[in-house]
Amino acid sequence: TVEKAQWLEAAGFRQIVLARETTLDDTRRIAQAVKVPLEAFVHGALCVSYSGRCYASQYCFGRSANRGCCAQFCRLAFDLVDADGRIIVADRHLLSLRDMNRTSSLEEMMDAGVRSFKIEGRLKDVSYVKNVTAWYRQEIDKIIRRRPETYRRASFGTSQLTFTPDATRSYNRGFTNYFLHGRTAAPVHSFATPKAVGPVVGQVQRVRRQSFTLIPSDHLSAPIVGGDGLCFVGADGKLQGFRVNKAEGHEIFPNRMPRLPLGVTLHRSLDFAFDKTLAKPTAKRTLALDIAFREVPSGYALDMADETGCHVSLFFEYEHTVAQTSQREAVIRQLSKLGDTCFVARQ
């Protein structure tokens, strides 16, 4: 609330992290009421309890979610029973929420006053961290390039990636914007499964004894390959999955042939080729360096300044001589050789 934010600012806090449930309107009001920077959640797992204050794990398993030891109680399957004991819904994951993904609302959040974004990453692996952070860096930079008069990066340097970031290709239970725009009709739950489902890859066209034919989705990011994990929701409403042994075009050969209904939609829950790429070095961050080589009365000077504002000048006492041919290109070529450093010559 505005009052809580003002109290925290008065107490000396230099940054405030907003609750996941905070709407855009409330974010805007808080930003107008305080001077400290605001940070907001933008991606990752959601807790079914209000603002993550959950005591179910502690009560049932002796593991406090408020101390980082959540037993994932809300990801279990439950029955929904009425007052007379009749089962209305059986064996569904009634408390399991989708994962947050606010990619489409980044600019709205920035305009509302958010100055940094928080990605939930409890128990996530290195591949997840690489892909998701690179994805949001890319999306934020697009906004900054389009509106340089309004926003600038808080950090320096440029990261060169060896892969194309895509948040849909990392672990997720399906996505939701949560309550950013208030309580809407858009689903926030994932009743079928608490596990990763992944993006749609296509529909089953034909089934054989050891293989099936896939009609690929128009949004298929990469071909199906051996090692991929595919899944589908069965007639009982439960998620079923299998690994791909090999793929020959649109003909898919599973390790173990599942009972696939014709026309069923398949998702890729494990992207083998993408994870293999992310397991290797995937980024190099460099700082731009401006270099000036000039004459001074006692010899020569070399001035270097990076984009953070750090500046160094070196002086060399040498006698001035007139070269028979211009040395300008040779000097530029030599000074541009920065080797294995974190710098790249800008000018």
Predicted regions: what is each one?
Residues 1-2:
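Active-site beta->alpha loop and helix N-cap motifs at the rims of alpha/beta catalytic domains
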